[in-house]
Amino acid sequence: MEGNARGGGHSEALKNYNLGRTLGIGSFGKVKIAEHKLTGHRVAIKILNRRQMRNMEMEEKAKREIKILRLFIHPHIIRLYEVIYTPTDIYVVMEYCKFGELFDYIVEKGRLQEDEARRIFQQIISGVEYCHRNMVVHRDLKPENLLLDSKYNVKLADFGLSNVMHDGHFLKTSCGSPNYAAPEVISGKLYAGPEVDVWSCGVILYALLCGTLPFDDENIPNLFKKIKGGIYTLPSHLSALARDLIPRMLVVDPMKRITIREIREHQWFQIRLPRYLAVPPPDTAQQAKMIDEDTLQDVVNLGYEKDHVCESLRNRLQNEATVAYYLLLDNRFRATSGYLGADYQESLERNLNRFASSESASSNTRHYLPGSSDPHASGLRPHYPVERKWALGLQSRAQPREIMIEVLKALEDLNVCWKKNGQYNMKCRWSVGYPQATDMLDVNHSFVDDSIIMDNGDVNGRLPAVIKFEIQLYKSRDEKYLLDMQRVTGPQLLFLDFCAAFLTKLRVL
Protein backbone atom coordinates (compact mmCIF):
# COMPACT_ATOMS: atom_id res chain seq x y z
CA MET A 1 0.00 0.00 0.00
CA GLU A 2 1.18 3.49 -0.74
CA GLY A 3 1.40 6.18 1.90
CA ASN A 4 -0.93 9.10 2.39
CA ALA A 5 1.47 11.48 0.74
CA ARG A 6 0.78 9.80 -2.58
CA GLY A 7 -3.00 9.89 -2.14
CA GLY A 8 -3.55 12.69 -4.62
CA GLY A 9 -4.59 15.39 -2.13
CA HIS A 10 -6.78 13.08 -0.03
CA SER A 11 -4.29 12.70 2.83
CA GLU A 12 -6.11 14.81 5.44
CA ALA A 13 -9.55 13.30 4.85
CA LEU A 14 -8.17 9.75 4.70
CA LYS A 15 -5.61 10.03 7.48
CA ASN A 16 -6.67 6.65 8.88
CA TYR A 17 -5.97 4.84 5.61
CA ASN A 18 -3.08 4.04 3.30
CA LEU A 19 -4.34 4.42 -0.26
CA GLY A 20 -3.42 1.82 -2.85
CA ARG A 21 -4.11 1.20 -6.51
CA THR A 22 -7.19 2.34 -8.38
CA LEU A 23 -9.77 -0.43 -8.82
CA GLY A 24 -12.00 1.47 -11.20
CA ILE A 25 -12.79 4.89 -12.64
CA GLY A 26 -16.27 6.27 -13.22
CA SER A 27 -17.71 9.43 -14.71
CA PHE A 28 -17.71 11.32 -11.43
CA GLY A 29 -15.15 9.51 -9.29
CA LYS A 30 -12.93 6.51 -8.75
CA VAL A 31 -12.64 3.50 -6.46
CA LYS A 32 -9.35 2.78 -4.71
CA ILE A 33 -8.17 -0.05 -2.54
CA ALA A 34 -6.87 1.09 0.85
CA GLU A 35 -5.56 -0.30 4.11
CA HIS A 36 -7.07 0.69 7.44
CA LYS A 37 -4.00 1.67 9.47
CA LEU A 38 -5.29 0.61 12.88
CA THR A 39 -6.50 -2.89 11.97
CA GLY A 40 -4.47 -3.57 8.83
CA HIS A 41 -7.57 -4.70 6.94
CA ARG A 42 -8.33 -3.77 3.36
CA VAL A 43 -11.25 -1.62 2.26
CA ALA A 44 -12.50 -0.10 -0.97
CA ILE A 45 -12.95 3.68 -1.00
CA LYS A 46 -15.23 5.43 -3.46
CA ILE A 47 -13.97 8.95 -4.08
CA LEU A 48 -16.84 11.02 -5.45
CA ASN A 49 -16.19 14.50 -6.80
CA ARG A 50 -18.99 16.80 -5.66
CA ARG A 51 -18.75 19.20 -8.60
CA GLN A 52 -18.85 16.44 -11.19
CA MET A 53 -21.82 14.84 -9.44
CA ARG A 54 -23.68 18.14 -9.47
CA ASN A 55 -22.95 18.63 -13.16
CA MET A 56 -24.28 15.17 -13.94
CA GLU A 57 -27.18 15.46 -11.48
CA MET A 58 -25.99 12.34 -9.67
CA GLU A 59 -25.93 13.68 -6.12
CA GLU A 60 -29.28 12.08 -5.28
CA LYS A 61 -28.05 8.69 -6.50
CA ALA A 62 -25.04 8.83 -4.19
CA LYS A 63 -27.09 10.01 -1.23
CA ARG A 64 -29.57 7.19 -1.79
CA GLU A 65 -26.87 4.53 -1.78
CA ILE A 66 -25.25 5.91 1.37
CA LYS A 67 -28.58 6.13 3.17
CA ILE A 68 -29.47 2.53 2.36
CA LEU A 69 -26.07 1.00 3.10
CA ARG A 70 -25.89 2.77 6.46
CA LEU A 71 -29.07 0.94 7.43
CA PHE A 72 -28.00 -2.53 6.32
CA ILE A 73 -25.92 -5.17 8.10
CA HIS A 74 -26.10 -8.44 6.20
CA PRO A 75 -23.47 -11.01 5.15
CA HIS A 76 -24.51 -10.73 1.50
CA ILE A 77 -24.85 -6.96 1.20
CA ILE A 78 -21.76 -4.81 0.78
CA ARG A 79 -20.76 -3.27 4.11
CA LEU A 80 -20.44 0.50 4.51
CA TYR A 81 -17.87 1.37 7.17
CA GLU A 82 -17.87 5.16 7.08
CA VAL A 83 -18.55 8.23 4.95
CA ILE A 84 -16.20 11.22 5.02
CA TYR A 85 -17.37 14.56 3.63
CA THR A 86 -15.14 17.40 2.45
CA PRO A 87 -16.05 20.55 0.49
CA THR A 88 -14.79 18.94 -2.73
CA ASP A 89 -15.28 15.19 -2.32
CA ILE A 90 -17.25 12.45 -0.61
CA TYR A 91 -15.29 9.39 0.52
CA VAL A 92 -17.34 6.22 0.93
CA VAL A 93 -15.37 3.53 2.78
CA MET A 94 -16.77 0.11 1.94
CA GLU A 95 -16.05 -3.59 2.15
CA TYR A 96 -13.38 -4.77 -0.28
CA CYS A 97 -14.41 -7.64 -2.56
CA LYS A 98 -11.27 -9.36 -3.83
CA PHE A 99 -12.71 -11.18 -6.83
CA GLY A 100 -14.75 -8.36 -8.33
CA GLU A 101 -17.97 -8.70 -10.29
CA LEU A 102 -20.02 -11.86 -10.66
CA PHE A 103 -20.34 -10.85 -14.32
CA ASP A 104 -16.61 -11.39 -14.93
CA TYR A 105 -16.77 -14.70 -13.07
CA ILE A 106 -19.56 -15.97 -15.35
CA VAL A 107 -17.74 -14.75 -18.47
CA GLU A 108 -14.59 -16.56 -17.37
CA LYS A 109 -16.20 -19.84 -16.32
CA GLY A 110 -19.24 -19.97 -18.59
CA ARG A 111 -22.27 -21.77 -17.21
CA LEU A 112 -21.76 -22.94 -13.63
CA GLN A 113 -22.34 -26.34 -12.14
CA GLU A 114 -25.78 -26.49 -10.56
CA ASP A 115 -24.51 -26.76 -6.98
CA GLU A 116 -22.29 -23.68 -7.36
CA ALA A 117 -25.04 -21.72 -9.11
CA ARG A 118 -27.44 -22.67 -6.33
CA ARG A 119 -25.02 -21.54 -3.60
CA ILE A 120 -24.62 -18.15 -5.29
CA PHE A 121 -28.35 -17.83 -5.93
CA GLN A 122 -29.20 -18.69 -2.32
CA GLN A 123 -26.95 -15.86 -1.17
CA ILE A 124 -28.47 -13.41 -3.67
CA ILE A 125 -32.01 -14.23 -2.56
CA SER A 126 -30.98 -13.87 1.08
CA GLY A 127 -29.67 -10.35 0.43
CA VAL A 128 -32.65 -9.34 -1.71
CA GLU A 129 -35.08 -10.63 0.89
CA TYR A 130 -33.31 -8.58 3.57
CA CYS A 131 -33.71 -5.48 1.40
CA HIS A 132 -37.42 -6.11 0.89
CA ARG A 133 -38.05 -6.74 4.58
CA ASN A 134 -36.49 -3.35 5.24
CA MET A 135 -38.74 -1.79 2.58
CA VAL A 136 -36.00 -1.28 -0.01
CA VAL A 137 -36.21 -2.52 -3.60
CA HIS A 138 -32.89 -2.69 -5.46
CA ARG A 139 -34.24 -2.18 -9.03
CA ASP A 140 -30.90 -2.81 -10.74
CA LEU A 141 -29.95 -6.38 -9.91
CA LYS A 142 -27.48 -7.80 -12.42
CA PRO A 143 -24.16 -9.69 -12.26
CA GLU A 144 -22.25 -6.41 -12.64
CA ASN A 145 -23.74 -5.23 -9.31
CA LEU A 146 -23.02 -8.48 -7.47
CA LEU A 147 -19.49 -8.66 -6.05
CA LEU A 148 -17.46 -11.65 -4.87
CA ASP A 149 -15.32 -11.54 -1.73
CA SER A 150 -12.19 -13.58 -0.99
CA LYS A 151 -14.31 -16.69 -0.33
CA TYR A 152 -16.40 -16.20 -3.49
CA ASN A 153 -19.41 -15.16 -1.44
CA VAL A 154 -21.86 -12.74 -3.04
CA LYS A 155 -22.32 -9.14 -1.93
CA LEU A 156 -25.16 -7.01 -3.29
CA ALA A 157 -23.80 -3.62 -4.31
CA ASP A 158 -24.68 -0.41 -6.16
CA PHE A 159 -27.86 0.73 -4.45
CA GLY A 160 -27.83 4.04 -6.32
CA LEU A 161 -31.03 3.21 -8.23
CA SER A 162 -32.77 1.70 -5.23
CA ASN A 163 -35.94 3.11 -3.80
CA VAL A 164 -37.31 2.95 -0.29
CA MET A 165 -40.79 1.47 -0.57
CA HIS A 166 -43.59 3.30 1.19
CA ASP A 167 -46.90 1.66 2.00
CA GLY A 168 -49.37 2.55 -0.71
CA HIS A 169 -46.90 4.09 -3.13
CA PHE A 170 -46.06 2.55 -6.48
CA LEU A 171 -42.84 3.11 -8.38
CA LYS A 172 -42.77 4.22 -11.98
CA THR A 173 -39.18 5.25 -12.71
CA SER A 174 -37.66 2.99 -15.33
CA CYS A 175 -34.43 1.78 -13.79
CA GLY A 176 -31.80 -0.81 -14.42
CA SER A 177 -30.34 -2.57 -17.44
CA PRO A 178 -32.83 -3.55 -20.18
CA ASN A 179 -31.71 -7.21 -20.28
CA TYR A 180 -32.56 -7.66 -16.60
CA ALA A 181 -35.56 -5.31 -16.40
CA ALA A 182 -39.06 -6.67 -15.83
CA PRO A 183 -41.80 -6.17 -18.48
CA GLU A 184 -43.73 -3.73 -16.30
CA VAL A 185 -40.62 -1.57 -15.91
CA ILE A 186 -39.76 -1.19 -19.60
CA SER A 187 -43.47 -0.66 -20.34
CA GLY A 188 -43.56 2.34 -17.98
CA LYS A 189 -46.29 0.78 -15.85
CA LEU A 190 -46.68 1.31 -12.13
CA TYR A 191 -45.11 -1.41 -10.00
CA ALA A 192 -44.81 -2.04 -6.26
CA GLY A 193 -41.15 -3.03 -6.35
CA PRO A 194 -40.40 -6.50 -4.92
CA GLU A 195 -41.72 -8.36 -7.96
CA VAL A 196 -39.30 -6.39 -10.16
CA ASP A 197 -36.33 -7.74 -8.22
CA VAL A 198 -37.77 -11.27 -8.49
CA TRP A 199 -37.74 -10.98 -12.30
CA SER A 200 -34.12 -9.77 -12.27
CA CYS A 201 -33.16 -12.67 -9.99
CA GLY A 202 -34.76 -15.03 -12.50
CA VAL A 203 -32.60 -13.59 -15.28
CA ILE A 204 -29.51 -13.91 -13.07
CA LEU A 205 -30.33 -17.54 -12.22
CA TYR A 206 -30.72 -18.29 -15.93
CA ALA A 207 -27.31 -16.68 -16.59
CA LEU A 208 -25.67 -18.70 -13.80
CA LEU A 209 -27.03 -22.01 -15.09
CA CYS A 210 -26.80 -21.34 -18.83
CA GLY A 211 -23.93 -18.88 -19.25
CA THR A 212 -26.15 -16.70 -21.47
CA LEU A 213 -29.06 -14.31 -21.00
CA PRO A 214 -32.69 -15.39 -21.55
CA PHE A 215 -33.51 -12.08 -23.25
CA ASP A 216 -30.85 -10.70 -25.55
CA ASP A 217 -30.91 -8.77 -28.80
CA GLU A 218 -28.75 -5.99 -30.23
CA ASN A 219 -31.92 -4.30 -31.45
CA ILE A 220 -33.55 -2.67 -28.42
CA PRO A 221 -37.14 -2.77 -29.79
CA ASN A 222 -36.71 -6.49 -30.46
CA LEU A 223 -35.26 -6.98 -26.98
CA PHE A 224 -38.24 -5.21 -25.41
CA LYS A 225 -40.61 -7.32 -27.49
CA LYS A 226 -39.02 -10.50 -26.17
CA ILE A 227 -39.17 -9.29 -22.58
CA LYS A 228 -42.77 -8.10 -22.78
CA GLY A 229 -43.79 -11.39 -24.37
CA GLY A 230 -41.71 -13.53 -22.04
CA ILE A 231 -40.08 -15.13 -25.08
CA TYR A 232 -37.05 -17.28 -24.19
CA THR A 233 -35.91 -20.91 -24.34
CA LEU A 234 -34.77 -23.27 -21.60
CA PRO A 235 -31.70 -25.38 -22.54
CA SER A 236 -32.10 -29.13 -22.27
CA HIS A 237 -29.22 -29.51 -19.81
CA LEU A 238 -31.19 -27.85 -16.99
CA SER A 239 -32.49 -30.11 -14.24
CA ALA A 240 -36.23 -30.64 -13.85
CA LEU A 241 -36.37 -28.52 -10.68
CA ALA A 242 -34.44 -25.65 -12.28
CA ARG A 243 -36.75 -25.83 -15.31
CA ASP A 244 -39.66 -25.47 -12.90
CA LEU A 245 -38.28 -22.53 -10.89
CA ILE A 246 -37.01 -20.23 -13.66
CA PRO A 247 -40.34 -19.93 -15.55
CA ARG A 248 -42.10 -19.10 -12.27
CA MET A 249 -39.76 -16.15 -11.81
CA LEU A 250 -40.00 -14.97 -15.43
CA VAL A 251 -43.79 -14.60 -15.49
CA VAL A 252 -44.79 -11.47 -17.43
CA ASP A 253 -47.77 -10.70 -15.17
CA PRO A 254 -46.24 -9.44 -11.88
CA MET A 255 -49.38 -10.50 -9.99
CA LYS A 256 -48.73 -14.13 -10.98
CA ARG A 257 -44.97 -14.04 -10.51
CA ILE A 258 -43.48 -16.15 -7.74
CA THR A 259 -42.56 -14.29 -4.51
CA ILE A 260 -39.31 -14.35 -2.57
CA ARG A 261 -40.90 -16.53 0.08
CA GLU A 262 -42.12 -19.00 -2.54
CA ILE A 263 -38.63 -19.10 -4.05
CA ARG A 264 -37.25 -19.95 -0.62
CA GLU A 265 -39.75 -22.79 -0.27
CA HIS A 266 -39.02 -24.22 -3.72
CA GLN A 267 -37.41 -27.65 -3.69
CA TRP A 268 -34.50 -26.58 -5.91
CA PHE A 269 -33.64 -23.70 -3.56
CA GLN A 270 -33.83 -25.89 -0.44
CA ILE A 271 -31.12 -28.32 -1.59
CA ARG A 272 -27.96 -27.89 0.56
CA LEU A 273 -29.34 -24.66 2.03
CA PRO A 274 -26.89 -23.46 4.74
CA ARG A 275 -28.31 -23.19 8.24
CA TYR A 276 -27.75 -19.44 8.49
CA LEU A 277 -29.80 -18.91 5.32
CA ALA A 278 -32.55 -21.26 6.48
CA VAL A 279 -33.46 -19.15 9.52
CA PRO A 280 -35.38 -15.85 9.28
CA PRO A 281 -33.41 -12.87 7.99
CA PRO A 282 -31.94 -10.68 10.73
CA ASP A 283 -33.85 -7.59 11.79
CA THR A 284 -32.01 -4.27 11.71
CA ALA A 285 -33.36 -3.26 15.13
CA GLN A 286 -32.18 -6.52 16.70
CA GLN A 287 -28.78 -6.26 15.02
CA ALA A 288 -28.12 -2.94 16.72
CA LYS A 289 -28.68 -4.63 20.09
CA MET A 290 -26.09 -7.36 19.55
CA ILE A 291 -22.40 -6.84 20.12
CA ASP A 292 -19.75 -9.52 19.70
CA GLU A 293 -17.74 -9.67 22.92
CA ASP A 294 -14.52 -10.98 21.37
CA THR A 295 -14.46 -8.25 18.72
CA LEU A 296 -15.34 -5.65 21.35
CA GLN A 297 -12.33 -6.72 23.41
CA ASP A 298 -10.10 -6.42 20.34
CA VAL A 299 -11.24 -2.82 19.89
CA VAL A 300 -10.62 -2.10 23.58
CA ASN A 301 -7.12 -3.52 23.15
CA LEU A 302 -6.55 -0.91 20.44
CA GLY A 303 -6.98 1.79 23.09
CA TYR A 304 -10.69 2.63 23.04
CA GLU A 305 -12.85 2.80 26.16
CA LYS A 306 -15.28 -0.11 26.38
CA ASP A 307 -18.35 1.89 27.43
CA HIS A 308 -17.75 4.42 24.66
CA VAL A 309 -17.52 1.69 22.04
CA CYS A 310 -20.69 -0.03 23.30
CA GLU A 311 -22.66 3.19 23.36
CA SER A 312 -21.51 4.12 19.86
CA LEU A 313 -22.48 0.69 18.51
CA ARG A 314 -25.89 0.78 20.17
CA ASN A 315 -26.64 4.16 18.65
CA ARG A 316 -25.18 3.23 15.25
CA LEU A 317 -22.71 6.11 15.43
CA GLN A 318 -19.82 6.46 12.99
CA ASN A 319 -16.46 7.05 14.62
CA GLU A 320 -12.98 5.51 14.65
CA ALA A 321 -13.97 2.91 17.23
CA THR A 322 -17.03 1.61 15.37
CA VAL A 323 -15.16 1.52 12.05
CA ALA A 324 -12.46 -0.61 13.70
CA TYR A 325 -15.10 -2.84 15.33
CA TYR A 326 -16.90 -3.68 12.09
CA LEU A 327 -13.67 -4.19 10.16
CA LEU A 328 -12.42 -6.62 12.80
CA LEU A 329 -15.79 -8.35 13.04
CA ASP A 330 -16.16 -8.89 9.30
CA ASN A 331 -12.61 -10.09 8.78
CA ARG A 332 -12.71 -12.44 11.77
CA PHE A 333 -15.66 -14.42 10.48
CA ARG A 334 -14.64 -14.18 6.85
CA ALA A 335 -11.34 -15.84 7.76
CA THR A 336 -12.94 -18.74 9.64
CA SER A 337 -15.63 -19.71 7.15
CA GLY A 338 -16.81 -19.17 3.63
CA TYR A 339 -20.22 -18.45 5.08
CA LEU A 340 -19.74 -15.35 7.16
CA GLY A 341 -23.32 -15.31 8.41
CA ALA A 342 -23.25 -18.78 9.98
CA ASP A 343 -20.22 -18.12 12.15
CA TYR A 344 -21.39 -14.60 12.90
CA GLN A 345 -24.76 -15.80 14.14
CA GLU A 346 -23.38 -18.69 16.19
CA SER A 347 -20.77 -16.45 17.80
CA LEU A 348 -23.34 -13.84 18.70
CA GLU A 349 -25.53 -16.52 20.23
CA ARG A 350 -22.61 -17.78 22.33
CA ASN A 351 -21.64 -14.31 23.49
CA LEU A 352 -25.18 -13.21 24.19
CA ASN A 353 -25.77 -16.40 26.17
CA ARG A 354 -22.65 -15.57 28.13
CA PHE A 355 -23.93 -12.03 28.77
CA ALA A 356 -27.32 -13.34 29.89
CA SER A 357 -25.82 -15.87 32.30
CA SER A 358 -23.68 -13.19 33.94
CA GLU A 359 -26.47 -10.62 34.12
CA SER A 360 -27.16 -11.23 37.80
CA ALA A 361 -23.51 -10.65 38.66
CA SER A 362 -23.16 -7.36 36.81
CA SER A 363 -25.46 -5.44 34.53
CA ASN A 364 -22.42 -3.82 32.90
CA THR A 365 -21.52 -7.05 31.09
CA ARG A 366 -24.65 -6.92 28.94
CA HIS A 367 -24.06 -5.30 25.57
CA TYR A 368 -27.46 -5.30 23.95
CA LEU A 369 -30.06 -2.60 24.31
CA PRO A 370 -32.68 -2.69 27.08
CA GLY A 371 -36.15 -3.61 25.95
CA SER A 372 -35.07 -6.33 23.55
CA SER A 373 -36.52 -9.82 23.58
CA ASP A 374 -34.49 -12.92 24.36
CA PRO A 375 -31.24 -12.03 22.60
CA HIS A 376 -30.40 -15.53 21.41
CA ALA A 377 -33.90 -16.75 20.58
CA SER A 378 -34.15 -15.26 17.11
CA GLY A 379 -31.41 -17.47 15.74
CA LEU A 380 -33.02 -20.62 17.13
CA ARG A 381 -36.46 -20.32 15.56
CA PRO A 382 -37.00 -23.54 13.64
CA HIS A 383 -39.68 -22.32 11.27
CA TYR A 384 -39.72 -19.50 8.80
CA PRO A 385 -42.18 -16.79 9.89
CA VAL A 386 -45.42 -16.09 8.11
CA GLU A 387 -44.85 -13.50 5.42
CA ARG A 388 -46.14 -10.08 6.35
CA LYS A 389 -49.05 -8.96 4.25
CA TRP A 390 -48.95 -5.24 3.66
CA ALA A 391 -52.29 -3.51 3.34
CA LEU A 392 -51.55 -0.58 1.08
CA GLY A 393 -54.37 1.91 1.47
CA LEU A 394 -58.10 1.24 1.75
CA GLN A 395 -59.35 -2.19 0.72
CA SER A 396 -62.65 -2.79 -1.05
CA ARG A 397 -64.38 -5.53 -3.05
CA ALA A 398 -66.52 -2.99 -4.92
CA GLN A 399 -66.01 -2.55 -8.66
CA PRO A 400 -63.37 0.00 -9.78
CA ARG A 401 -65.92 2.26 -11.51
CA GLU A 402 -68.09 2.34 -8.39
CA ILE A 403 -65.11 3.15 -6.19
CA MET A 404 -63.91 5.99 -8.42
CA ILE A 405 -67.40 7.52 -8.61
CA GLU A 406 -67.50 7.68 -4.81
CA VAL A 407 -63.99 9.13 -4.73
CA LEU A 408 -64.95 11.92 -7.14
CA LYS A 409 -68.06 12.71 -5.11
CA ALA A 410 -65.99 12.98 -1.94
CA LEU A 411 -63.44 15.22 -3.64
CA GLU A 412 -66.21 17.46 -4.92
CA ASP A 413 -67.75 17.75 -1.45
CA LEU A 414 -64.38 18.81 -0.04
CA ASN A 415 -63.67 21.31 -2.85
CA VAL A 416 -60.62 19.43 -4.10
CA CYS A 417 -59.17 20.22 -7.52
CA TRP A 418 -58.04 17.12 -9.37
CA LYS A 419 -56.40 16.11 -12.62
CA LYS A 420 -56.48 12.70 -14.27
CA ASN A 421 -53.01 11.17 -14.32
CA GLY A 422 -53.94 7.70 -15.54
CA GLN A 423 -56.92 5.38 -15.77
CA TYR A 424 -57.14 5.00 -12.00
CA ASN A 425 -54.69 7.63 -10.85
CA MET A 426 -55.14 11.35 -10.23
CA LYS A 427 -53.25 14.32 -8.87
CA CYS A 428 -55.14 16.43 -6.35
CA ARG A 429 -54.79 19.91 -4.90
CA TRP A 430 -56.60 21.13 -1.79
CA SER A 431 -56.41 24.80 -0.86
CA VAL A 432 -56.45 25.92 2.75
CA GLY A 433 -58.59 28.87 1.73
CA TYR A 434 -61.78 26.88 2.24
CA PRO A 435 -63.48 27.09 5.66
CA GLN A 436 -62.92 23.47 6.68
CA ALA A 437 -59.25 23.68 5.71
CA THR A 438 -58.74 26.92 7.61
CA ASP A 439 -60.25 25.38 10.73
CA MET A 440 -57.90 22.41 10.51
CA LEU A 441 -54.93 24.70 9.92
CA ASP A 442 -55.69 26.76 13.00
CA VAL A 443 -55.98 23.68 15.19
CA ASN A 444 -52.77 22.09 13.95
CA HIS A 445 -50.72 25.27 13.94
CA SER A 446 -51.58 26.03 17.53
CA PHE A 447 -49.57 23.14 18.94
CA VAL A 448 -47.13 22.00 16.22
CA ASP A 449 -43.96 23.74 15.15
CA ASP A 450 -43.81 24.55 11.44
CA SER A 451 -40.53 22.73 10.94
CA ILE A 452 -42.00 19.49 12.28
CA ILE A 453 -44.91 19.29 9.89
CA MET A 454 -43.10 20.54 6.81
CA ASP A 455 -41.22 18.64 4.18
CA ASN A 456 -37.49 19.40 4.31
CA GLY A 457 -37.83 21.71 1.34
CA ASP A 458 -40.82 23.55 2.75
CA VAL A 459 -39.37 24.86 6.00
CA ASN A 460 -39.56 28.58 5.39
CA GLY A 461 -41.22 29.85 8.55
CA ARG A 462 -44.81 29.59 7.36
CA LEU A 463 -47.25 26.90 6.32
CA PRO A 464 -47.80 26.34 2.60
CA ALA A 465 -51.16 27.41 1.19
CA VAL A 466 -52.08 24.05 -0.35
CA ILE A 467 -51.85 20.32 0.10
CA LYS A 468 -50.96 18.30 -2.97
CA PHE A 469 -51.48 14.55 -3.05
CA GLU A 470 -52.10 11.62 -5.38
CA ILE A 471 -54.93 9.10 -5.35
CA GLN A 472 -54.47 5.72 -6.97
CA LEU A 473 -56.57 2.58 -7.28
CA TYR A 474 -55.00 -0.78 -8.02
CA LYS A 475 -55.86 -4.47 -7.85
CA SER A 476 -54.35 -6.84 -5.29
CA ARG A 477 -53.71 -10.57 -5.47
CA ASP A 478 -56.83 -11.55 -3.49
CA GLU A 479 -59.32 -9.91 -5.88
CA LYS A 480 -59.64 -6.81 -3.74
CA TYR A 481 -59.08 -3.24 -4.87
CA LEU A 482 -56.87 -0.88 -2.88
CA LEU A 483 -57.29 2.89 -2.79
CA ASP A 484 -54.17 4.77 -1.84
CA MET A 485 -53.57 8.43 -0.96
CA GLN A 486 -49.99 9.74 -1.06
CA ARG A 487 -49.06 13.23 0.16
CA VAL A 488 -46.76 15.15 -2.19
CA THR A 489 -46.42 18.52 -0.44
CA GLY A 490 -48.07 20.34 2.44
CA PRO A 491 -48.29 20.00 6.25
CA GLN A 492 -48.41 16.38 7.34
CA LEU A 493 -50.93 16.82 10.13
CA LEU A 494 -53.24 18.86 7.96
CA PHE A 495 -53.05 16.12 5.34
CA LEU A 496 -54.05 13.55 7.97
CA ASP A 497 -57.00 15.72 8.94
CA PHE A 498 -58.01 15.90 5.30
CA CYS A 499 -57.75 12.11 5.00
CA ALA A 500 -60.10 11.73 7.96
CA ALA A 501 -62.60 14.11 6.37
CA PHE A 502 -62.24 12.31 3.05
CA LEU A 503 -62.95 8.93 4.64
CA THR A 504 -66.17 10.16 6.19
CA LYS A 505 -67.38 11.11 2.72
CA LEU A 506 -66.78 7.68 1.20
CA ARG A 507 -69.74 5.34 1.27
CA VAL A 508 -68.49 2.41 -0.77
CA LEU A 509 -65.37 1.31 1.11
From Swiss-Prot:
This is Serine/threonine protein kinase OSK4. The gene is OSK4. It comes from the Eukaryota. InterPro entries: KA1/Ssp2_C (IPR028375), KA1_dom (IPR001772), Kinase-like_dom_sf (IPR011009), Prot_kinase_dom (IPR000719), Protein_kinase_ATP_BS (IPR017441), Ser/Thr_kinase_AS (IPR008271), UBA (IPR015940). The lineage of its organism: Eukaryota, Viridiplantae, Streptophyta, Embryophyta, Tracheophyta. One of its GO terms (cellular component) is nucleus. It comes from Oryza sativa subsp. japonica (Rice). The keyword Transferase applies. Keywords: ATP-binding, Kinase, Nucleotide-binding, Nucleus, Serine/threonine-protein kinase, Transferase. Suppressor of flowering in long days (LD) via the that up-regulation of HD1 and the down-regulation of EHD1. Can phosphorylate HD1 in the presence of HDR1.
